């Protein structure tokens, strides 16, 4: 769902 995408993006940003 949309929230899963948001969590994925947040994980990528957190990985930076």
UniProtKB/Swiss-Prot annotation:
**InterPro entries linked to this entry:** Aurein_antimicrobial_peptide
The main location is: secreted
Any single biological process term in GO: defense response to bacterium
The record's tissue-specificity note reads: Expressed by the dorsal and submental skin glands.
Which keywords appear in this protein's UniProt record, sorted alphabetically?
Amidation, Amphibian defense peptide, Antibiotic, Antimicrobial, Secreted
Q: Which GO terms describe its cellular component?
A: extracellular region
Q: What is this protein called?
A: Citropin-1.3
- Leucine amide modification sites are 16
Q: Which residues form the signal peptide?
A: none
**Which Pfam families does this UniProt record tie to the protein?**
Antimicrobial20 (PF08256)
- Cellular compartments annotated: Secreted
**Domain of life of the native organism:** Eukaryota
- Briefly state the protein's biological role: Bacteriostatic action for Gram-positive bacteria.
